[in-house]
Regions:
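A cross-family glycoside hydrolase active-site/sugar-binding cleft signature
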Residues: 75, 88, 142
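Glycine-centered loop/turn positions within well-structured domains
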Residues: 62, 70-72, 83, 92, ...
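A short local loop/turn or secondary-structure capping micro-motif enriched for an aromatic residue
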Residues: 72, 80-83, 147-150
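Core segments of cupin and vicinal oxygen chelate
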Residues: 27, 33-72, 76-78
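Short secondary-structure boundary/hinge segments and terminal tails
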Residues: 63-65, 83, 118-120
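Vicinal oxygen chelate
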Residues: 2-8, 13-24, 29-37, 78-153
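Alpha-helical elements of the RecA-like P-loop NTPase motor core of helicases
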Residues: 43-44, 95, 140
Length: 153
């Protein structure tokens, strides 16, 4: 595998200030754009479920920032297909979000095939739930990261 040189134009110290353990810069997801029929309504829907803040509007986007610093930038669009977004949450956050989903009358499912309506799953010793946002994007909340083999489906 080829290694590309990392350069930081204008930096007197090169990229050392951007490197992590072993001199390698940690790779992190910073943001993603989520197409929406109504960017404000979609951003607010997610923010309400996850108990986060939507906005303020930034250019073409309405951002929702997660606790680990990833920004979901909602943008008005008319031409898009459904996407999937999974959020790792604590047990307490899961309980609160599931209560908000149910209180809002949002249909939820135990798996991505939208089977077992009204149920949750217990994969990998945790809990998970799937539900659609107003644009048809499939959202997922999990309390444990998934591994190579599902357990407790």
């Amino acid at each position: 595998m080829a290694t590309l040189p990392i350069t930081c134009p204008g930096s007197p110290t090169g990229c050392n200030s951007h490197t992590g353990e072993g001199g390698k810069k940690p790779i992190e997801l910073n943001h993603t754009i989520i197409p929406a029929k109504d960017k404000w309504a979609s951003a607010q829907f997610l923010a309400d479920i996850l108990n986060l803040e939507a906005g303020p509007e930034w250019g073409h986007f309405v951002p929702v920032k997660t606790d680990n610093g990833v920004t979901l930038d909602f943008s008005d669009s008319t031409d898009f297909g459904p996407r999937h977004f999974a959020f790792l949450v604590s047990e307490a956050e899961f309980d609160a979000a599931l209560a908000r989903i149910r209180a809002a009358g949002v249909k939820h499912y135990a798996n991505f095939r939208r089977e077992r309506p009204g149920e949750i799953n217990h994969l990998y010793g945790g809990r998970g739930v799937y539900f659609d946002d107003p644009n048809g994007h499939l959202l997922e909340l999990i309390t444990r990261p998934y591994g190579p083999t599902p357990e407790g489906g």
